[in-house]
Amino acid sequence: MLCCSLAASNARAEKRAIVPKEFATGPGATGLPYTPGILIDGTLYVAGQVGRDLKTGQIPTEFESEVRNTLDNAGLVLKAAGLGFEDAVAVQVYLTDMELFPRMNTVYATYFKDPRPARTTVGVAKLVGTARIEITITARK
């Protein structure tokens, strides 16, 4: 019995790529070698999302719009995995200017309801292109 339990616990969990159709083609497609989300053992790991408008491929100049786009893009990955913002357990926010923190928080609060996920916000020197914010999410039903 013990050998069977050990063998079962060593089995690799199936890892599934989550790629929303909106990410696959068009101006919003990055062509970068990464997967927007990985689902394994019921936990979704959302890769860093920026505020690129998926219709134009551009990042808005208005910061609140950039934050909304960033969260909407992350939301597409959550939805493609059958999850939503209410399933988020951890969020990492990267900002190129910590002075933008209060403005980010105002938009962020409209997406995440109580109990809100654990969150870390980090100031960074640079993000891809003109992005001022990048967000990663870990979610689980």
For the regions a protein language model found, what residue spans apply to each?
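N-terminal presequence-like segments and the immediate start of the first folded domain
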Residues: 1-72, 76-89, 95-141
